[in-house]
């Protein structure tokens, strides 16, 4: 499967990006990471901590996809597709995507269905994954789409 196959399946659309958009997305991910660290220091709930860390992951994944010239089509499964698309950037072997998908599902339960189900270990793990994904995405963009990053 390729990004173009995803376009044919109507999961993605081609859309150019530029360094301003990528810088904005990476700054947004950085902001969510700062908020995550503040939530940890302030002892906010593990649900809130995981939600902020997950947002940093999702935004970083969006930056990778946008740097490649694609965006997820609106209308359902946007977060799922954004995470799965990391296969075409930082995770071609799909080593971390299953973990990120579990975190996505955990975040969804905490956001939409129930509260207090996130453990400290899960929140901490999500925070570590967020830092990792953010760094790997920036490194990947610098290597593969240097014209899209300052």
Tell what function each PLM region has.
Residues 1-150:
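Terminal alpha-helical segments
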């Amino acid at each position: 499967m390729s990004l173009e196959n995803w376009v044919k399946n109507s999961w993605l659309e081609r859309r150019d990006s530029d360094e301003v958009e990528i810088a904005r997305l990476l700054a947004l991910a950085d902001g969510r990471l700062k908020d995550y660290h503040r939530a940890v220091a302030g002892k906010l709930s593990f649900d809130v901590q995981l939600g902020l860390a997950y947002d940093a992951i999702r935004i970083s994944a969006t930056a990778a996809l946008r740097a490649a010239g694609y965006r997820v089509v609106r209308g359902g499964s946007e977060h799922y597709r954004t995470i799965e698309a990391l296969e075409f950037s930082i995770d071609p072997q799909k080593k971390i995507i299953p973990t990120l998908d579990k975190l996505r599902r955990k975040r969804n339960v905490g956001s939409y269905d129930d509260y207090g189900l996130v453990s400290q270990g899960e929140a901490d793990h999500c925070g570590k994954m967020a830092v990792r994904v953010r760094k790997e995405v920036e490194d990947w963009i610098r290597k593969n789409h240097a014209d899209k990053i300052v």
